[in-house]
């Protein structure tokens, strides 16, 4: 299968790439702007070839294309002949979305739209969207998928918009979309993350007091 993974140099992307490589028979094209993940992160997971935008051609092994999800022409080019798009690239976290709501909206809404459009134009049949628990907002437990969303942050709103576009592209264009609401993902290679779980692990390893606010 031919896979496109946006944000593939991040923690979840690297974990997915390792799993796919272990299965063999997969070609993987990573699109990343390298603001969080790095070439070194990808190299520690696998051997890859970096391909310039002008040299994108047929899928071949693991490739890295350095670029921005807001580049709609690049999205169409990257997704050509893909079997599935895994859209992980995003502006992550509530804090940054409050500091710069416009940047959050552009990355998480327009960036997602660009790759759904790339899927539609290139007849890519499957699209997986990395969402978050943030669209649910502040609700009383038990929490389940059928609860009406009530986002309380720009980040939650932008991820909810992405979910809405995925639903629309499934109903309108028959793209098989899947939305995954990740929450505090952790595992090997995640200690650099700013999530509460990664912070607790770092504090525990350093024999520090675990701080809980609220």
Each predicted region: which residue ranges?
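N-terminal Rossmann-like NAD(P)+-binding domain of SDR-like oxidoreductases, especially those catalyzing
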Residues: 1-185
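Active-site loop immediately N-terminal to the catalytic Tyr-X3-Lys motif
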Residues: 101, 189-193
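Short alpha-helix within the catalytic core of nucleotide-sugar-dependent glycosyltransferases
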Residues: 35, 197-198
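A conserved pocket-lining segment of Rossmann-fold NAD(P)-dependent short-chain dehydrogenase/reductase
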Residues: 97, 177-189, 199-214
